[in-house]
Amino acid sequence: MKVTLPEFERAGVMVVGDVMLDRYWYGPTSRISPEAPVPVVKVDTIEERPGGAANVAMNIASLGAHSRLVGLTGIDDAARALSKTLADVNVKCDFVSVPTHPTITKLRVLSRNQQLIRLDFEEGFEGVDPEPMHERIAQALGSIGALVLSDYAKGALASVQQMIQLARKAGVPVLIDPKGTEFERYRGATLLTPNLSEFEAVAGKCKNEEEIVERGMKIIADFDFSALLVTRSEQGMTLLQPGKPPLHMPTQAQEVYDVTGAGDTVIGVLAATLAAGNSLEEACYFANAAAGVVVGKLGTSTVSPIELENAVRGRADTGFGVMREDELKVAVAAARKRGEKVVMTNGVFDILHAGHVSYLANARKLGDRLIVAVNSDASTKRLKGETRPVNPLEQRMIVLGALEAVDWVVSFEEDTPQRLIAGILPDLLVKGGDYKPEQIAGSEEVWANGGDVMVLNFEDGCSTTNIIKKIQKDSQ
């Protein structure tokens, strides 16, 4: 199916809410402390990730939209770490610094994939003057297409009603990820996105979808919401709007590893899609697809445009099928971040036969992802002669992309893929035939980067040339 993503690059979104820094200390443990009956962790890895409203802003930026973040922080190392990390992913931070409070920080100590303890560094921001935040919102309303209020009940949204009214007067939709059961404080919001447990804490336990719809519509009327999106984990999402039939969307998740931060991804994609000019129904469709991707990752994560496009095509993973070179580089970087081994091969693949399929299947077994680089029509003609290719580039790439063994397909114009390989730098470069490894284009670059080069045998008796000769002979 042809998928057209929203024009995220022209979307502007402001996120206001409780920002926090998630810190992770990892290490092995092999003994019990002599001081107390607790394990001793030898910390060897430290990670810092934006959390809360900051993760929402990061999700919006990852789509290519203009993301601006407003929140309360202290004047400390955690605030500086947040600012730097977010600036690196193109989130514009406009924090209100509160010298009497620390930046909210959650430190987790983990060993052998188990969390041993969590330490929270925080003081509620209730009572802090909200006017500086109101000023930042008012200044931005003319340049944004959506306002997200991300509530973790830490005090940044103590004046949430004034924030909603500022946006409503400017005609800017307000999307809220709620906290707690006091939906009254969100009165007048455009869209509320509670998960099922948050929804039922207000509406009561629901036996079926009919009860969800009935009670959801009552909540919309009671609190003057324009719409309500109930996220229901493995049951997908339900969008409710006055005067319209409910829209039920089944989950698109293939595998669920971690639901951490999935709500941040949902509201981030919703806001960016609305700000790009799409309808609420379309925004929910893309948000549902994004949720299916992000729960397949460990920890709080974001979704790239490539991942989102492939998810709505029905293949919820990091980039599948035919790609441009720039898209492929992004997909490969994401795969490496997950620790996946990338294998790359190349060829003309003019008339796909059993030998090709067997070779590609064997290449795929050598790693986690397989890239197939394909000679363009002009490159093939120079290599094989004026009568080739039999099948044009687009058709060759589509057929290759449909193979289970192949993750990504990309084309190159040159006689050899050396430049392309040097730009991708796969972990393993594979070529079929009777080559020596040093004869393979791109081998020097791959070796220099610490990768490997391998030659695989083709299946005997299978060749495009022989197929063409047989066709010509049979037609005489």
Curated annotation (Swiss-Prot):
Q: Which GO terms describe its biological process?
A: ADP-L-glycero-beta-D-manno-heptose biosynthetic process
UniProt-annotated stretches for the region Ribokinase: 1-318
Q: Which GO MF terms are attached to this record? A: ATP binding; heptose 7-phosphate kinase activity; heptose-1-phosphate adenylyltransferase activity; phosphotransferase activity, alcohol group as acceptor
Family annotation (InterPro entries): Bifunc_HldE, Carboh/pur_kinase_PfkB_CS, Cyt_trans-like, PfkB_dom, RfaE_dom_I, RfaE_dom_II, Ribokinase-like, Rossmann-like_a/b/a_fold
Q: Out of the domains of life, which is the source?
A: Bacteria
Pathway per its UniProt entry is: Nucleotide-sugar biosynthesis; ADP-L-glycero-beta-D-manno-heptose biosynthesis; ADP-L-glycero-beta-D-manno-heptose from D-glycero-beta-D-manno-heptose 7-phosphate: step 1/4; Nucleotide-sugar biosynthesis; ADP-L-glycero-beta-D-manno-heptose biosynthesis; ADP-L-glycero-beta-D-manno-heptose from D-glycero-beta-D-manno-heptose 7-phosphate: step 3/4
- Which EC class is the enzyme in? transferase
The active site consists of D264
CDD domains per the UniProt record, alphabetical: RfaE_like (cd01172)
HAMAP family this protein is in? Answer: HldE (MF_01603)
User: Which protein family is named in the record?
Assistant: In the N-terminal section; belongs to the carbohydrate kinase PfkB family. In the C-terminal section; belongs to the cytidylyltransferase family.
* Designated name of the protein: Bifunctional protein HldE
Please report the organism this UniProt entry assigns to the protein: Enterobacter sp. (strain 638)
The lineage is: Bacteria, Pseudomonadati, Pseudomonadota, Gammaproteobacteria, Enterobacterales
Provide the gene name from the record: hldE
